[in-house]
Design a protein with these regions (language model features):
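Cationic, histidine-enriched alpha-helical/coil surfaces that engage anionic ligands
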Residues: 1-502
C-alpha cells in the first residue's frame, strides 16, 4: 500500500447564522467565483485513548465522500500549513500512516474517537484566465464522540485553501474581506480540535513555562527539543531533506542540556537518558555523515576542470554513495522501530512529567545558569589550547575533534540559557558557533581524506587512474591546513574577556 503527500495551506473562520459571505471578486486578482456544489463528507478520526495525536496537532481520519476519499494523516508544519499524507480507502489504519505516528503512539491502539458529518458547499476562486487561486468552502458540521459518551456538537465554519503553488497574498486579501463581513479566525486549528473542545473531550494542553527559576528554563528547553525530536521522527520516516540532520541536532541538544545542567537535574536520573541519546545520535550519524560527505565530494569534483577529471570518477562516487545511503537509511528506519528507541521516548516524557529537580532548580535562573555555561566554556578553552599546541598530524586532528565537541556543548548551553540571560548568552553562543564551524569543516576534511584514500585504492585495483582522487586528497589537505590557521582568529574573538560576563 502506498501513500502520497499534499502540502495544505488553509485558514479557517468562525461564522454565524446572520453572517453572509462577502463579494470576493477583485480581491488579489480574483475575477470569478465558481459554485462547485455541495458534497456530503463522513469522516471518522482515530487517536489513542489519551489523545496523543490531537495533543500534538496531528489528525488521522478515514473519510468517505468527495473527490479525495481515503485515509488522511495531517502533520503540522507551521501556522496554517500542514502536510496531508494520503492512503487508499480501507478498513484498518494503513501501515504507512501508522508508522509515521509510531513515535507518538508507541504501541498504543489507534481507535475511532470522533465522527464528523459535514455538508461542504464549495466555491472556486478563479483569476481572469480561469486558473484556480483558492478554494472556499462553507462546512456545516455535526460531531459525535465515539467513546461511548453522549457528546455531540454542531457548528458552521469557512475554510479557504490556497491552490498548489498559489500566492499567500490571495489568502490575505480574502481574509480582509471575510473579517470585514464579520467572520473571525477559528479558535481551533482543526475540526477535530473544535469537536473535542465543544464536547468537553479536549486533548491535554501543552505545559508552558510558569516561572523564572533555573528549573523552569531548563525544562522549557528540554520540552522544546523533545518536540523537535518527535517532529523530526515523522520527517525522517518520510525521507524529507535535512530531516536526519534535524533529528540528530535535537538529540545532541537534549543530551548536552542533560550533561551541562547537572546542578539543576539529578544526574542519577538523567545520565541513563543521556547515554541512550548518545546511542541514538550515533545511529543517526551513519545516515547524516554519508549525506554530508557525498555532497562535499560531489562539489569538489564539479569544481574541477574537465581535463583533471580522469576516469569514471563520478560513476565510482555515485556507486559508493548509493550503496552507503541505502544501507544507512535502512539502518536508520530500523532503529526508529526498535523497542530501545521507543523506551527512550518514554524516558524523555517521564523526565518532563516528573523532573528529578535538585535544590538549585528552584533558584533564580540568572544565578544558576551562568555557572553551567562558563564551566562548558572553560572545558572548550582547555581543549582548544591543547590542540593549538600540538604539531600538525593525527594527534592534532583528534584534539581538534575533541574541541569541536566541547564547542557544541558550550554553544548549546549558552543557547539554553539565552531566554534567561539575554544578549550576553546569545553573543557567546554566536562566537562559539563560529569556532564550531571552523572545527567542523576541519573534521569534515579529515573524514573526506580517509574516504578519498579508500576510493583511490579501489580505483587503482580496478585498473583505473587514481590521479583525480589524489588531487582531491591534496585539496582536502590544504583545506584542513587553512582551517587550522583560521582557528586562531575565530578563537581570539570567542575568548574575549567580556564574553564571559554573563
Amino acid at each position: 500500500m502506498t501513500a502520497d503527500t499534499k502540502r495544505e495551506i488553509e485558514r479557517k473562520y468562525e461564522t454565524g447564522p446572520d453572517i453572509r459571505l462577502p463579494r470576493l471578486k477583485g480581491a488579489a486578482g480574483i475575477a470569478e467565483t465558481a459554485d462547485r456544489g455541495v458534497t456530503e463528507l463522513d469522516a471518522v478520526y482515530y487517536d489513542t485513548a489519551d489523545l496523543r495525536l490531537a495533543a500534538a496537532g496531528i489528525t488521522l481520519r478515514r473519510r468517505t465522500g468527495g473527490e479525495d476519499a481515503g485515509w488522511h494523516l495531517k502533520l503540522p508544519v507551521a501556522p496554517d500549513v500542514r502536510d496531508e499524507v494520503r492512503a487508499p480507502l480501507g478498513d484498518g489504519v494503513p501501515e504507512p500512516l501508522a508508522a509515521l505516528v509510531r513515535a507518538r503512539t508507541r504501541g498504543a491502539e489507534l481507535a475511532p474517537v470522533v465522527r464528523l458529518l459535514s455538508a461542504r458547499d464549495v466555491r472556486h476562486l478563479l483569476d481572469a484566465q480561469g486558473t484556480l487561486l483558492a478554494e472556499l468552502s462553507t462546512d456545516t458540521v455535526r460531531a459525535q464522540l465515539l467513546d461511548g459518551t453522549p457528546g455531540r456538537a454542531e457548528w458552521t465554519e469557512v475554510e479557504v485553501e490556497l491552490a498548489d503553488g498559489g500566492d499567500l497574498a490571495v489568502l490575505d486579501a480574502v481574509e480582509k474581506r471575510l473579517r470585514k463581513a464579520g467572520l473571525r479566525p477559528a479558535a481551533s486549528a482543526s475540526k477535530l480540535a473544535r469537536a473535542l473542545a465543544d464536547t468537553g473531550r479536549q486533548a491535554p494542553p501543552k505545559r508552558k513555562k510558569t516561572g523564572d527559576t533555573a528549573g523552569d528554563h531548563v525544562l522549557s528547553y528540554l520540552r522544546a527539543h523533545v518536540d523537535a525530536l518527535l517532529a523530526a521522527d515523522a520527517a525522517v520516516r518520510r525521507d524529507l531533506p535535512d530531516s536526519v540532520h534535524k533529528m540528530r541536532v535535537a538529540t545532541r541538544r537534549l543530551r548536552s542540556a542533560l550533561r551541562s545542567y547537572r546542578k539543576v537535574l539529578d544526574r542519577a536520573a538523567t545520565d541513563p537518558v543521556a547515554e541512550e541519546l548518545k546511542w541514538l545520535g550515533g545511529e543517526l550519524g551513519v545516515d547524516r555523515d554519508q549525506e554530508v560527505l557525498t555532497e562535499r565530494l560531489t562539489a569538489r569534483i564539479d569544481a574541477l576542470p574537465g581535463t583533471l577529471v580522469l576516469g569514471p570518477v563520478r560513476g565510482r562516487l555515485r556507486v559508493w554513495a548509493t550503496a552507503g545511503r541505502a544501507g544507512a537509511r535502512g539502518r536508520t528506519l530500523a532503529v526508529l522501530d526498535t523497542d530501545r528507541y521507543l523506551a527512550l521516548l518514554d524516558a524523555l516524557d517521564a523526565l518532563l512529567t516528573d523532573p528529578p529537580l535538585r535544590p538549585a532548580a528552584g533558584k533564580p535562573a540568572a544565578k544558576v545558569l551562568p555557572r553551567a555555561v562558563l564551566k562548558e566554556y572553560e572545558r572548550l578553552a582547555a581543549r582548544v589550547d591543547r590542540a593549538l599546541a600540538l604539531p600538525p598530524g593525527e594527534e592534532r586532528d583528534l584534539a581538534l575533534h575533541a574541541a569541536r565537541k566541547a564547542a557544541k556543548r558550550t554553544r548549546y548551553a549558552a543557547e539554553a540559557a539565552a531566554p534567561a540571560l539575554g544578549k550576553p548568552a546569545k553573543r557567546l553562543a554566536r562566537r562559539v558557533k563560529s569556532v564550531q564551524k571552523v572545527l567542523g569543516d576541519h573534521q569534515d576534511s579529515v573524514v573526506a581524506r580517509a574516504t578519498l584514500r579508500d576510493l583511490a585504492i579501489k580505483a587503482y585495483a580496478a585498473g583505473e587512474t587514481a590521479f583525480t582522487w589524489g588531487l582531491l586528497y591534496g585539496q582536502e589537505q590544504a583545506s584542513a591546513a587553512e582551517r587550522e590557521r583560521e582557528l586562531g582568529e575565530v578563537w581570539a574573538a570567542a575568548s574575549a574577556g567580556k564574553l564571559r560576563r554573563l
